[in-house]
């Protein structure tokens, strides 16, 4: 007679408890930081709640179920980006879009990152977003096919027309000009995401492991050693301004590459990327192979030190003229001596990514 059914009352009760639980978590978190004085990033007790945003077709593989959740309260990020066109996002689309967004927003100038399986297969900066895209695509055109593209500027019609020339899974950017959407929306399956900025800016990130969770501060290119003015010249002569800009670009771009990572760059663009190898020699070889003739005269960044001089030797033999790396190996002197003997410049940052 106009009342609620038992099932409806149960559903409303569950919803009410989810709201009160979220509120209790917020209160407990605030009290730990503000009243008890615990470190807000790594408190003794940690709680959070999420609301399901969508059920996905499947997870990383077709036999895995999956869903995407947003934080309570919602925060800026890939999970809350506005999809303005295209097929439903997949689990892998979300993972790659997150990596692409972080890579593109590592730069203040117009930048484009093209991601496949969480690794950049193209990344570049330029005076315009269209130029940055064309340079990023030229890094590895074969691998860029079917990639996820992030732009840290509004997408113009010119950029949209360039991207429409090839198959792309996802494009994520702060905004899109109306004429750009008119071009891109002709591709009915292309997923277009509007994401106003680089993300929520939270200081930590977590990773679920069996029996618990690891939490760490987010790896951003903002440490003292990320400033080129703090780098130490350990071999060769100081570089000119153009080479210095390329070294700085290579160092920032290398952060988004899975270790062991070697990135070769020229004119504000990656020309060869070696990623995810279990030793630095193979990463150097892969970067040189991908760069082909473009390795000669390029600069290189390594995400960690050279444990031996052999990986550096691969770069020297390919014609790389300057290298930036963290340093810190017990055999640093061997790498420094090899660079000096080859007549190339080497800087150390004292920071690892």
Where are these regions (language model features)?
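Beta-strand/loop-alpha-helix module characteristic of Rossmann-like adenine-cofactor folds
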Residues: 1-29
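ATP-dependent carboxylate/acyl-activation modules
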Residues: 19, 23-353
